[in-house]
């Protein structure tokens, strides 16, 4: 089973799990996808939406606890990525500098100086980008507090926003009938972003 199929059936397969374990599972996935480079393939959007559906369907799950943990996991994950880029990535590039690397760093610094705040916020909604943008921001030495504020806003808009969309899809009658269409939107968006990124790289 593919990761996208697993995410799409998250509410069905993991609903029997005890609430505490479900919290830990969702928070762990969010942190890994946003903070650990090797976990860029995790389908965070679909997981968040499905977690909201599960929270609405279970009486023993607290949506406030769920979204608070998701916010913290997303926020801390991006902070880890930023610090990794700044403390490890930048020194490594400076140690192994070349004209090509210097040009890349200069371009990254110029981009983050002009568009960094919005890039960090918007990257949350694009698979892969939300994993790699924070460490690149660190490498480019984006001002810490500027990154901090963008990270917080992005964590709320993405982590809390998508989870609550799933939650209300299952609790509001007018939206419930469209819950699968909304879930499909997030899954298709994830697939399209991967396809576009790969096509641009070739």
Language-model features: where?
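Transmembrane alpha-helix interface/packing and boundary motifs in multi-pass membrane proteins
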Residues: 27-48, 123
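Short hydrophobic/aromatic, small-residue-rich stretches within specific transmembrane helices
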Residues: 67, 151-152
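Hydrophobic alpha-helical transmembrane bundles that constitute the permease/transmembrane domains
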Residues: 128-132, 152, 156-159
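Membrane-helix interface "capping/anchor" motifs
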Residues: 35-44, 142-145, 149, 201
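Transmembrane alpha-helical segments of integral membrane proteins
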Residues: 157-168
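Membrane-interfacial helix-loop-helix
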Residues: 1-28, 53-146, 171-186, 193-202
């Amino acid at each position: 089973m593919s990761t996208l199929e697993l995410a799409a059936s998250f509410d069905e397969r993991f609903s029997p799990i005890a609430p505490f374990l479900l919290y830990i599972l969702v928070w762990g996935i969010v942190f890994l996808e946003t903070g650990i480079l090797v976990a860029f393939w995790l389908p965070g959007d679909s997981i968040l939406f499905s977690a909201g559906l599960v929270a609405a369907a279970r009486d023993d799950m607290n949506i406030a606890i769920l979204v608070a943990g998701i916010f913290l996991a997303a926020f801390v994950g991006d902070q880890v990525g930023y610090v990794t880029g700044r403390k490890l990535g930048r020194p490594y590039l400076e140690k192994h500098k070349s004209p090509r690397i210097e040009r890349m760093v200069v371009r990254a610094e110029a981009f983050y100086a002009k568009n960094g705040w919005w890039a960090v916020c918007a990257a949350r909604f694009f698979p892969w980008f939300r994993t790699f943008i924070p460490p690149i921001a660190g490498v480019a030495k984006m001002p810490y507090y500027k990154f901090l504020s963008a990270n917080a806003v992005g964590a709320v808009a993405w982590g809390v926003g998508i989870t609550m969309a799933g939650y209300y899809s299952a609790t509001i009658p007018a939206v419930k009938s469209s819950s699968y269409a909304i879930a499909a939107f997030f899954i298709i968006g994830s697939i399209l972003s991967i396809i576009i990124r790969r096509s641009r790289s070739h």
